[in-house]
Swiss-Prot record:
Transmembrane segments: none annotated. Pfam families: RNA_pol_Rpb2_1, RNA_pol_Rpb2_2, RNA_pol_Rpb2_3, RNA_pol_Rpb2_6, RNA_pol_Rpb2_7. GO terms for molecular function: DNA binding; DNA-directed RNA polymerase activity; ribonucleoside binding. The lineage of its organism: Eukaryota, Viridiplantae, Streptophyta, Embryophyta, Tracheophyta. The gene is rpoB. This is DNA-directed RNA polymerase subunit beta. Its main location: plastid.
Amino acid sequence: MLRNRNEGMSTIPEFSQIQFEGFCRFIDWGLAEELHKFPKIEDTDQEIEFQLFVETYQLAEPLIKERDAVYESLTYSSELYVPAGLIWKPGKDMQEQTVFIGNIPLMSSLGIFIVNGIYRIVINQILQSPGIYYRSELDHNGIFIYTGTIISDWGGRSELEIDRKARIWARVSRKQKISILVSSSAMGSNLREILENVRYPEIFLSFLNERDKKKIGSRENAILEFYQQFACVGGDPVFSESLCRELQKKFFQQRCELGRIGRRNMNRRLNLDIPQNNTFLLPRDVLAAADHLIGMKFGMGTLDDMNHLKNKRIRSVADLLQDQFGLALVRLENVVRGTICGAIRHKLIPTPQNLVTSTPLTTTYESFFGLHPLSQVLDRTNPLTQIVHGRKSSYLGPGGLTGRTASFRIRDIHTSHYGRICPIDTSEGINVGLIGSLAIHARVGPWGSIKTPFYEISERSKRLQLVYLSPSVDEYHMVAAGNSLALNRGIQEEQAVPARYRQEFLTIAWEQIHLRSIFPFQYFSMGASLIPFIEHNDANRALMSSNMQRQAVPLSRSEKCIVGTGLERQAALDSGVSAISEREGKVIYTNTDKIILSGNGDTITIPLVMYQRSNKNTCMHQKTQVSRGKCIKKGQILANGAATVGGELALGKNVLVAYMPWEGYNFEDAVLISERLVYEDIYTSFHIRKYEIQTHVTSQGPERITKEIPHLETHLLRNLDRNGIVMLGSWVETGDILVGKLTPQTAKESSYAPEDRLLRAILGIQVSTSKETCLKLPIGGRGRVIDVRWIQKKGGSSYNPETIRVYISQKREMKVGDKVAGRHGNKGIISKILPRQDMPYLQDGTPVDMVFNPLGVPSRMNVGQIFECSLGLAGDFLGRHYRVAPFDERYEQEASRKLVFSELYEASKQTANPWVFEPEYPGKSRIFDGRTGDPFDQPVLIGKSYILKLIHQVDDKIHGRSSGHYALVTQQPLRGRAKQGGQRVGEMEVWALEGFGVAHILQEMLTYKSDHIRSRQEVLGTTIVGGTIANPGDAPESFRLLVRELRSLALELNHFLLSEKDFQIHRKEA
């Protein structure tokens, strides 16, 4: 009954394991399965036959390493070679050659792909599993209508429904339905076979009338009737082979191919024994489905829950890559067939290598990784983000749902998600509940089901046995909830425990329990598992926290958290950002870019990542942790990566915080910080921006990279070398030239500027015919040039241009407007940076680093931050780090509070500071105003919290428009910083301005600064010359647009302008 047994306690599986297993499944048998489907190809005269011998295909080792593929913007892939034969039938001669099919992208050691130098990941998709599902719904008369929905492997749906008169219909389209007798006859069964293979033949005979008897009298009549209803054609169609082919292609192939998983599900649900290799819908399936539908009508059998995970399947990277490989082979088949026919027509002798080209496979995979919604650019903001992105599961994508049509029931948490899909970690917004994250112990089975581990409780064996169960199995067992299990087994056996059974929650005796959870974190994803005291937080805030941890910026000097959950080490290890020794040895050389080990008579060089840019512009860098002469063991950390310290994840800093209002500067989630965080580089981070330019071959000639740029100030060109490219280590400011480039153009005499013609006439100087198209540093890009790459592709044509990339590093301190957050959904914007002498200070004189608003806690119900804050203070004084598993109340009542207070009490005793733990108000302390030295009226909660700096920084957001583009239709300024857009003045902003009575500002915003074309053109001249800006004489463009749209609906809107002088009405045409 319970399979896949492993004895003993399990470790947490590697977080990229699901990706690795999926890719290995594709390489091991997905490739071979698709290659075996490749047909033998003959020419039109059937004299030449081409075939692939797929038993001995080969995948070559990659020609480049992963690091080089990223640096040179190449794809990390392997070449696929397959033996192919060309047989001449008249003489039975055969020519065999090994042909190159194409490149298959390989998964890297981190479970990701490198395509054109960009890290990409393929996320898992959750689809409705193919098979049959029964459900009921009320019609307009209040009567239950029972339907059975058959879902194909391609996602196509067919329905069987039974009406009030117990007649069974097959619905072929939304509006058309046909008798099940006709559809079964069209599939190849006669009336006698139908009646012999059903459980209730009398019901089938009851709705058989004379008209239906004629239709099912012959298969041709049944097919004609089926086609007429399916295609909605009138008249009397004539039976033909082309009609059969059209029906086969449009209906049966799309809606009747079940696949391996669908055949397995269909056999289980309908108690059939059809072989697994028979993957198409058979008449026997349809009749068995009709029998079950009749049983449902009369109260026999159970309806299906479509949202249960046993009725879902995971479409992993293996399935997606296999589908694309099959598509590429179909394209290759067409290419080979066309090439054979062309060679015969021109009387050429083909060879297997001449017939096969690598283009179909290469282009198919390039378009898949570039365009498919489930192939995404890897989010590399910090190490945690990389892990979580690979463990996402999505209901969206081809064959899935859309954000606008998905119902609340699909988005909601289901009991079958327990231990499989995290109930907390999902995206916010329109995709809430549709994009989730797999729980940390979840794994994907070979049939696409998500499995989770349990301990099986057996009377015969005293040892606990670990079993991985799919959702369809554990539903029928009593599963004890893991958050209520006591440590003492003897006490545990005497008590009643809460348990799950068939989607119900019960309280039963311990002897009746079949299974129990193995781990407190079992239900959560990686992001949620890093939140300490998560059980004390509202789920909405825990969701925000798990999302915001992925947005944390790696800091220049990271720090381990005082209060954690214990998974920080594994998160850092599985992210691959740290350099880890793969063997024992001795360090003989260390530098910033490499470490050299010696052992067993040879040396090994370990290259380190130096100032690598992530796709979110954060800095990925490795710092050496070992010194020369030190002996190293296998698995020891040699260098810390970004946001890791000592092999643990370190996303933020432990800072001293106080929860109190301060002059309104922390109103509505604003945060007050000390200047110490700025001057001591506590929250300083490095960001690397990439700027690139390409050189093309134009119709007038090639573009040139040069330092000699006419008509530009020498100051702007000061950082260029003799080739016209910015020098490494240069400090560049906004507007500086990074790459000098000239584009040739044809210049007519009339197009020259007057000064150009003067120079030519007097001095005889030949005016340049090239246009300056240099790469300039945009606004906000100032920094240090750390790398320049000149990528020259083979055969530099206009289709294959050269690319020059310049990487500039920026050092960013904390500023007003930056976003910070804790690990409990407590986020805020920095409102003011106070001098440290003005900050509130503790009784030992220590100034506070951050001041949070206490009103942010009660309404949000994220009390976990209070526990973390106080325990962090105790840990700071005692020099301890705490790793607290969630749901510690399963050991005793109020366990979290007791732990915090006992540690605070010990810290108070050891440091001889009674104010650390005061029994009257435990956790709080009297603190003083830094400006006056007076104590505040009330005791204030103080402590050490782990605060993150998020990627939402004011330098990337702040923007002002001086002039820019306008929308073509409305003639209003565009929106967004990237388009140099304007600020939107919405309805509520207009109300505020109206409330102040600022008529002129309102008029400017509605006319000159927005969409009054003539008036805004006059503003410039009036501003230069001086004088009064004239009032706009007619309606703005948006009003004219409204009038035109009403006219298109045959509604005439007249508008009039009232003269200020004589109050006469003047009609104006819109």
